[in-house]
């Protein structure tokens, strides 16, 4: 949202200082300066006058008629020039009207004009004050005025004191004054607005500003650039720092000025940070946290990484996650925990007190879980610190595998990964979760254009080489079922996968050339990068893996081989909760899920609970792991661990 005060033909915004503070040096000087009369012929427009847009002939003529009838009601403000001349800093329209009367021989060139003479160093400020109070002052004029005063050596604070503006507003206008001349010319000619200029001001390099401006004009309707396109072109390799959990965790001090881009014109005065630099800084801090935990808790090794250790093929070959031992509470902790739970249950609504109670209970639980890891366990294991769902994820009891371990543990791994029978899952839940899974696979595939291209090519080859060539050019059809998928998936349109898909769609739609739907040749002008992005997105949207059940038999998910090919993990896009999953299961299924995840202690506790409480219990204990129901993920490859399994034909 624009916060500038200089947009043409809009009300003055709040950056003006209150009226009581507007008694500036200039106004005080003008109040003390006596009027004098000088001949009309000695007056010219001051070179320091910020007015650049010509006065309309009609307005000058109307003012001339008024002066003819009642005389000059307001004096002009001038400064001395060489040769007994005076430059008009405030009152340019009145000077134009007087000259019009002289041209009509209504007054003489020596007609006495009432003026106040001020020092030359205050001339620009006088012009700014005169025009700044007028509704028709053009933004380009205000920008030029601020720049002129800055070139005189005045600081933003001094300029603000002279004119009654806040220093912040002056800084913003001076930022616009640094734009490339061609852009300021476009503003003066009303081909763009201050909003366009604010977006372009994100880039400091004037050559790059012009490049972005021209590209936005070419892609805009009728040559009119779109503010969003400008902003996207400048920040395409960056992310906003506002509400960014990674940036908040790392901190601004972790970046150099070149890696941060400040947006002076945003409401929160935020900005952008380079994606690569942000991830590098995040990884460095995660490693530092891991080192601290290794020393403090006595683990053999540690690692900081971007993703948690999961069950994908690469991680399963390198790591083994030990089952989490049951928490070990001291007698004092158990008494305190019971007391806190009683106080928490007594509260009817969530409030500050309930948040404090929950935080203390979580701290006690965390300490008990850490204590459960014995020195023997820690001596042969490590701690991995990663980033997940906007928070730090700590995995303790991670062991490094040797090559022999992969073979020796094959049978045990299969037992852990043994799928629950999909036939035991209700059909409504099967539809819901396979829809959720489909959206997640779409979002993951969208991020891997090379795999999308391979999948599309394979699909086309099935038709071409299997059924003969088409009789018409490019008989390709694509059915996007986002409406039904979001209707069935528990997360609906609020899920991480669907929101990622829609964000990419919004990014791509502004890159489509004008008239593209009527003329395919418009796509010939697109870069290979844009074409590949469009192709990848459209291919991803065609993925459909909703399972059905007929005659008591559940269809096999077509997503299994594709997930293996792209290294997909459902928990990157979905978090099981009571509302979206556990609440739809029977109590024995909830207990089985906890056991399958290696949480045998939590499973035993769930046996004593009602179904609703067991569902909440499962949500709490599953939030920090990577468990996915066996029937919702691709089976682990049965071949040798070193054999490649990402065959692109199988992927489709």
Swiss-Prot record:
A Pfam cross-reference name: ParBc
Stretches for region Disordered: 1-21
MF terms (GO), sorted A to Z: DNA binding
Swiss-Prot/TrEMBL keywords: Plasmid
Composition skew (Basic and acidic residues), residue ranges: 1-13
InterPro entries to which the protein is assigned, alphabetical: Chromosome_partition/occlusion, ParB/RepB/Spo0J, ParB/Sulfiredoxin_dom, ParB/Sulfiredoxin_sf
UniProt cross-references to NCBIfam families, sorted A to Z: parB_part
Annotated family: Belongs to the ParB family.
Protein name according to UniProt: Uncharacterized protein YubM
Organism: Escherichia coli (strain K12)
Recorded name of the encoding gene: yubM
